[in-house]
């Protein structure tokens, strides 16, 4: 009998495919294997949130809320987990408190059990509304430390932040190592410090990008970690995660034995292996995403950001600029006060780095989002931004010091009015709130399909269709 069995959060239905194939796994591809996955005694199955919401309506023509309801029905014995960006919800801007509260309420009502909440800047003010709302709905709140390397980030910084999150109502703490920067002995020291500081469980989430994750996770387990994120082996490694089967085998017969059976996992592995072969054959998995890139320790690009950036550069015919962009990212990050690179700051810093390289002059063109980051719209940066840089970017406008959401008026009534002509369920207003440019087209196609209209040949502008 294991003295301290390690719990597993399986991420193959969310972060694994977000990292390796830009979040393109469909519900139809997931559904056949769900009954087998439901037999495994996971701590939780991460299957929703993050970029899945955007991908569903933008690329897959799926209703993300319907996806969640199907997952809830097909995985009745599992705790379903989502990734939530705090005040940014699943969109790319800060939202008013009433929108955040409503989203949490609807997520739990539709089947979510565990809400992993993070803020890109580790600003606790951006998590307070989401944590309170999740506590109220009875969900398990897993609050994240967005792990990164910089002159201002150390174990004391992370431990103090974890203590703050525990006091705010977190049920567990996740070390969110989105870029695979966490080294083995550093992980041991960090987990040891966290276990001395907080009384709640500690989870390790570490991407394999730099080839460190397996070693770091093992040292973290030895230091007292309670939960570990892994992905089924066909969609593991590279910019994804440590393989589930490998960890299960490594811990068998030890004090940390997970209790998971390799024979049961092998059925799931065989299914996802066929999907992997399909993704490689049709080009959805970029081979560059599958290898180890130790340069990650220099430019700190997380898995999902890397695969999306590769796709964007390929689509623009600018793949030859990849190395230049990767070298520019740390410079932009230093200018912006060392934000951890995770959504939305990864997109903000990454896009600005791309502009700096393509324009041939740094900050010749500055995105609205980068100005917002410097202005304080996304929260307090880990290090102060130099005044001369702030003045240059903001053209003399003063940055804010309060919680940005405190400057926002309640917005749900306005959003409901705007979305009313499309909405057929209460959740649609939230889809619209996060993606107001993309959602209307998705709603029109979905609603036409539900009404038996040929969505491919419908004339949405003139509201007509062939019969």
Descriptions of predicted regions:
Residues 236-258:
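C-terminal helical cap(s) of enzyme catalytic domains, especially alpha/beta-barrels
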Residues 1-21, 68, 73:
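N-terminal amphipathic alpha-helix/helix-capping segment at the start of soluble metabolic enzymes
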Residues 49-166, 173, 179-184:
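Active-site beta->alpha loop and helix N-cap motifs at the rims of alpha/beta catalytic domains
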